[in-house]
Amino acid sequence: MTISTQILPLVKEPERLENRLAEIPPEPGVYFMRDNSDRIIYIGKSRKLRSRVRSYFRDGYNKTERIATMVKLVTEIEFIVTDTEAEALALEANLIKQHQPYFNVLLKDDKKYPYLCITWSEDYPRIFITRKRQLGKEKDKFYGPYTDAGLLREIVRICKRIFPQRQRPQPLFKDRPCLNYDLGRCPGVCQKLTSPEEYRKIVQKIAMVFQGRTQELIDILTQQMNAAAENLNFESAARIRDQISGLKSLTADQKVSLPDDTVSRDAIALAANEEHACIQLFQIRAGQLVGRLAFVADAHAELGAILQRALEEHYQTADSVEIPLEILVQHDLPDSDILADVLTQRKGKKVTILTPLRQTKAELIEMVERNAQYELQRMQKFGDRNHQAMQDLAAILDLPDVPHRIEGYDISHIQGSNAVASQVVFIDGLPAKQHYRHYKIKNPTVTAGHSDDFASLAEVIQRRFRKYAEDPQLSRLGNPDWPDLIMIDGGKGQLSSVTAVLQEMNLLEDLRVVSLAKQREEIFLPGESKPSSTDAEQPGVQLLRRLRDEAHRFAVSFHRQQRSDKLKRSRLDEIPGLGHHRQKQLLGHFRSVDYIRQATTPQLAEVPGIGPRLAQEIYDYFHPA
């Protein structure tokens, strides 16, 4: 007889529950709740750990349906004691980001909303728009996410026009500045014609724009302009005057009707349906609306908790000047006093969080809520179209359910040379680029002058699913990496090669595979000699076409990259004594073979690993007598 060692939920073991609760101290800190798989399913904070955790298990405690479900799954409770509530708040935010517990309010990484990044980690910081906040370094600063990408681009364009700044991630030339320097758009950072300290002063002015301190910056520049004019430096005064004019154009028509125009405040509200919550945060400084930020969260929580999570995320990396004196919220926050205390300590002035009930401030919250509602409607309309496409595809292919994860594969080469493959992934009908993969084809029969798409596709599919074939015990159901559908770019031949290799791996019964031919958008199914009878304009077919086109684009871009790298290496391969490592050193230093050819012997010898003798051989190769 097998004895189960599965741990029961604490609610089913009252004695163990009471003992565990008694061990929790009445101090500030963070608590973890785990299920019987030892996964952290919830993380919370409290100024009194014991009373907060005990409240979850108290009869009559007002719990949401989601939290009530969570409590029934808890098998273990852990905690970390902190010195202050502020430390607990910061620790909780970091741990939620790290573990992504299922029952916590989680802000979605919605790449629709862009950020403005300033790379303070570099001596000469860059300023650019990005949707990939997670790639930034510790000292880099992100502002956003912004609801209006067009407006953000316009602000960046104006800032580039009025403040000379670094324009390129890498220098265009090794020994001279580019045209942007001659036009006054860049102070020549590539040749270090300005010091890092002076350049950072320029960037700090731009940062003030995104901190909502435009009027403060205008006042500073006005003083500098007047001082320059008094010193008869009229050229400098005229330049500053133009900067002030450009900044004033940013603040035109941005007035918000409030009785006072001196208090800095943020106003946050949301609109939610059964699945998603769209959150909008308006930043108001000196009576001006200087920023509209947007967040998306799961809606399976109390509305106040969702708002608090968004505020904690937003203010986690905020500077003291970016924290407002007043925060208006649509719903009461569960821990507004803790959040207010933390923000007060960081700002050095009292920060107030309140839910306005009347007059102008309540009207402001209503305006923010209306904007959140419009965004939710737009998201829902797009989501409905997407879901309709997945339902249509499920009907066309007779799938048991709508396909959550779809993978698309394509091959790219030129007559067999540099053959590569792409794997792209759509999750719920949208590209999930973090799951994209590319493959270099290793099949010895695929060489220059001899292509074999059938063998190439078979190789890629075999490599993709090899671990499942080698380990039959490896779970497939519920595995987020297991596709509900595979689409091959091609016709019957390509599909047959893929189904054959899946049959050999004993995986064909567990995977649905189709191919999509280019000419008539025809869908081929395994074992069928003729394509399915479908209309190319059906939503499901259009979804497959988007997947096919994305797989083709990704494969072609990787093929071009491989071909370009090979062309670069092939010329350097002809130089005796210049191995692969030294080639990388040269290309990393000079950026291209053309710049290597233009370099002098002493310049070549400066590269690590390239001595005077090899430098002379490289120079002689490009400059034969």
Swiss-Prot record:
Stretches of the chain forming a coiled coil according to its record: none
Q: Which CDD domains match?
A: GIY-YIG_UvrC_Cho
Q: GIY-YIG domain location, by residue?
A: 26-105
Cell compartment(s), UniProt: Cytoplasm
Q: By its UniProt entry, which Pfam families does this protein fall under?
A: GIY-YIG, HHH_2, UVR, UvrC_RNaseH, UvrC_RNaseH_dom
Q: What is its main location?
A: cytoplasm
* BP term (GO), one: SOS response
Family matches, as Gene3D superfamilies: 5' to 3' exonuclease, C-terminal subdomain, GIY-YIG endonuclease, UVR domain, UvrC, RNAse H endonuclease domain
UniProt entry keywords in alphabetical sequence? Cytoplasm, DNA damage, DNA excision, DNA repair, Excision nuclease, SOS response
Q: Which GO terms describe its cellular component?
A: cytoplasm; excinuclease repair complex
Against InterPro entries, the record matches this protein to: DisA/LigA_HHH (IPR041663), GIY-YIG_endonuc (IPR000305), GIY-YIG_endonuc_sf (IPR035901), GIY-YIG_UvrC_Cho (IPR047296), Hlx-hairpin-Hlx_DNA-bd_motif (IPR003583), RuvA_2-like (IPR010994), UVR_dom (IPR001943), UVR_dom_sf (IPR036876)
The UVR domain is annotated at 215-250
Any idea which GO molecular function terms this record carries? DNA binding; excinuclease ABC activity
Q: How does it assemble?
A: Interacts with UvrB in an incision complex.
Family (UniProt): Belongs to the UvrC family.
**Primary role:** The UvrABC repair system catalyzes the recognition and processing of DNA lesions. UvrC both incises the 5' and 3' sides of the lesion. The N-terminal half is responsible for the 3' incision and the C-terminal half is responsible for the 5' incision.
Name of the protein in its database record? UvrABC system protein C
State the organism named in the record. Nostoc punctiforme (strain ATCC 29133 / PCC 73102)
**This protein's encoding gene:** uvrC
